[in-house]
């Protein structure tokens, strides 16, 4: 029952980290908690920074387009090498792209042991599942407003700056929630940074916490609190996320996980679109010594699970 309890005070707590036990006691209040973490784990910030993508540029990351969240029910991501994703976001002038859910990227690079070293300071007792993530985005890009059902979720800023909007669970009646079991994401259909006319009336009824998080600080996001991140003007903003699921939390999530795995068994892959890339193939004809410029159009397949 405790896993389903929420706190509704529109207030962010600030604390001085002393030890893991005290952190867990404060987090059990289920309010957002902001604390300085650089002084506790300085190597975490020294070793994960704006170069973390460029130094591992051959490994793939998942890139999303925020516009997909407001165009339909299906959310597709594109897998790109880290170098290509970085260039895409640096040249994106419309603030559309961000990358997240990069567990594979972390596991396939030397970043995993750096994340793992934080468990001593952050991990609650009886945790069964631990997830690590690294995120960045185009200048002024945002993530959708959503909530999670994990036991603990910590985000931390390593470079640049983010602005975050948060609102408690009771706001859900105005947020048009969508439970997406295909991607296991519980989100709002409202863009809280730029609401459209259709949702303007409901948006005006909402109250938000809105504050900046600077490098060296970490935020505990309680379960069932709605939150959305806006990346700073600096395209080198790096944010990490560490999530823990306790035994009882796993039990409470079984119905949702069951729906997720059922959805996965009912999906099949189809080709959604192809990107024609026109290449000029210069072939020299030995007999005529003329160049045959034949346009070649290979197709790059992008897939979507439905």
Model-inferred region functions:
Residues 1-218, 228-306:
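N-terminal accessory scaffold of Fe(II)-dependent oxygenases
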């Amino acid at each position: 029952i405790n896993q389903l309890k929420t706190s509704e005070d529109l207030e962010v707590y600030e604390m001085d980290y002393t030890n893991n036990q005290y952190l867990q006691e404060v987090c059990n209040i289920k309010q957002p908690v902001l604390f300085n973490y650089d002084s506790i784990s300085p190597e975490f910030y020294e070793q994960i920074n704006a170069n973390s993508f460029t130094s591992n540029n051959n490994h793939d990351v998942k890139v999303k387009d925020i516009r997909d969240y407001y165009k339909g029910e299906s959310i597709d991501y594109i897998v790109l090498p880290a170098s290509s994703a970085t260039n895409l976001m640096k040249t994106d002038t419309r603030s559309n792209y961000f990358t997240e859910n990069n567990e594979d990227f972390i596991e396939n690079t030397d970043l995993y042991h750096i994340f793992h070293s934080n468990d001593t300071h952050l991990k609650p007792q009886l945790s069964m599942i631990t997830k690590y993530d690294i995120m960045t985005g185009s200048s002024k890009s945002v993530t959708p407003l959503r909530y999670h059902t994990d036991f603990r979720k910590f985000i931390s800023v390593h470079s640049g700056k983010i602005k975050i909007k948060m609102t408690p669970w009771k706001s859900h009646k105005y947020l048009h929630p969508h439970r997406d079991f295909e991607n296991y994401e519980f989100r709002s259909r409202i863009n809280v940074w730029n609401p459209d006319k259709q949702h303007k009336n409901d948006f005006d009824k909402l109250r938000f916490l809105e504050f900046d998080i600077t490098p060296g600080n970490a935020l505990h996001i309680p379960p069932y609190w709605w939150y959305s991140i806006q990346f700073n003007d600096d395209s080198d903003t790096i944010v990490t996320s560490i999530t823990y699921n306790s035994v009882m939390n796993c039990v409470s999530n079984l119905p949702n996980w069951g729906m997720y795995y059922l959805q996965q068994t009912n999906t099949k892959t189809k080709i959604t679109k192809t990107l024609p890339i026109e290449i000029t193939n210069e072939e020299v004809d030995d007999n005529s010594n003329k160049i045959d410029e034949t346009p070649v159009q290979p197709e790059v397949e992008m897939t979507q699970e439905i």
